C-alpha cells in the first residue's frame, strides 16, 4: 500500500449475468472516487482474492452484488474474520441475498452472515421500476450529505423480517412510490449493524444507471469513507 494514502479498499464484484453491466461501469466509477478522495482501491471479480493473507492489506471490503452464496466456506471465514477484526464492510444490493433457499448443493448455510445482516433473509423483489428512498437518519456520516429523499430506478429488494431494532436504519423505501411484490410497510433499504465497527448495507444499486444518480454516488462515496474511518 502507498503509505501516502490513508486506506486501501478491495471491491469484489459479482460475475452473475444480471450484474455484469454494473460491474463494468463500477470499476471506473470507484477508481474515480478513490482518486478524488485520496485512497487506494483494487477492483476485481475474482472471489479467490477473499483470503486471510490477501485481506490483510485492506481496511475496507466492498461486496458489489457478490452474494454470500458466491463464496466458498474458506472465503466466508476469511471475510467474517476481516469484519470481526473491526475493519470496514460495504454491501451493495445482491450482497444482501441471505437465506437458506440459496444454499448450493454440498455447501453449508452461512448463518453468521444472516445475523450480521440484521437477522433478515431476502424475499423476491418486484419488477425494476422507479421509486423513492426516504433518508431517515441524516446524522450518520454515510447519509449526512444526502437530501431528505431521492428517486432511483431499481430492483426494490424485499426481506422476510425487518432489521429495525437490531440495526441502525438510515433509509427506507417509500412503498407508495412503486408497486411492491410483498409490501413490508416499514421497509428499511439502507442500514448499519452497530454490533460491528463499520458495516453498512445498501439495498439499492442494481444497474449502471445508479452511478449517474448524484445522491447514490454520494452515498457510495461516504459509505466507503465512513467504513474506513478509525474513530
Stretches with model-predicted labels:
Residues 1-8, 36, 178-186, 193-231:
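Extracellular ligand-binding/catalytic regions of CAZymes and related secreted enzymes
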Residues 5, 34, 42, 119-196:
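Catalytic beta-strand/loop cores that center a nucleophilic Ser/Cys/Thr
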Residues 8-98:
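Helical hinge/lid and interdomain linker segments adjacent to catalytic or ligand-binding clefts
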Residues 16-17, 68, 96-98, 174-177, ...:
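Short, solvent-exposed loop/turn segments at secondary-structure junctions
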Residues 22-24, 55, 101-105, 182, ...:
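Short aromatic-enriched loop/helix-cap "lid" or pocket-rim segments at secondary-structure transitions
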Residues 70-144:
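A glycine-rich, often tryptophan-bearing local segment used as a flexible ligand/cofactor-contacting loop or short
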Residues 88-90, 168, 198:
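Proline-centered loop/turn at the N-terminus of a beta-strand
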Residues 112-118, 148-167, 206, 216-230:
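Oxidoreductase and adenylate-handling cofactor-binding alpha/beta cores
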Amino acid at each position: 500500500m502507498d503509505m501516502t494514502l490513508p486506506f486501501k479498499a478491495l471491491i469484489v464484484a459479482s460475475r452473475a449475468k444480471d450484474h455484469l453491466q454494473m460491474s463494468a461501469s463500477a470499476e471506473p466509477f470507484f477508481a474515480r472516487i478513490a482518486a478524488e478522495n485520496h485512497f487506494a482501491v483494487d477492483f476485481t471479480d475474482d472471489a479467490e482474492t477473499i483470503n486471510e493473507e490477501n485481506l490483510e492489506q485492506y481496511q475496507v471490503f466492498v461486496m458489489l452484488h457478490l452474494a454470500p452464496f458466491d463464496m466458498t466456506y474458506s472465503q466466508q471465514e476469511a471475510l467474517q474474520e476481516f469484519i470481526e477484526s473491526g475493519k470496514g464492510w460495504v454491501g451493495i444490493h445482491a450482497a444482501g441475498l441471505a437465506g437458506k433457499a440459496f444454499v448450493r448443493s454440498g455447501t453449508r448455510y452461512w448463518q453468521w452472515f444472516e445475523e450480521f445482516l440484521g437477522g433478515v433473509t431476502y424475499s423476491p423483489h418486484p419488477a425494476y421500476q422507479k421509486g423513492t428512498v426516504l433518508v431517515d437518519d441524516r446524522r450518520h456520516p454515510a447519509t449526512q450529505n444526502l437530501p431528505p429523499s431521492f428517486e432511483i430506478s431499481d430492483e426494490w429488494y424485499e426481506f422476510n423480517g425487518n432489521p429495525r431494532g437490531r440495526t441502525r436504519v438510515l433509509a427506507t423505501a417509500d412503498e407508495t412510490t412503486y408497486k411492491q411484490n410483498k409490501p413490508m410497510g416499514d421497509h428499511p433499504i439502507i442500514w448499519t449493524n452497530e454490533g460491528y465497527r463499520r458495516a453498512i448495507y445498501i439495498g439499492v444499486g442494481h444497474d449502471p444507471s445508479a452511478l449517474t444518480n448524484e445522491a447514490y454516488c454520494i452515498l457510495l462515496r461516504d459509505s466507503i469513507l465512513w467504513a474506513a474511518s478509525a474513530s
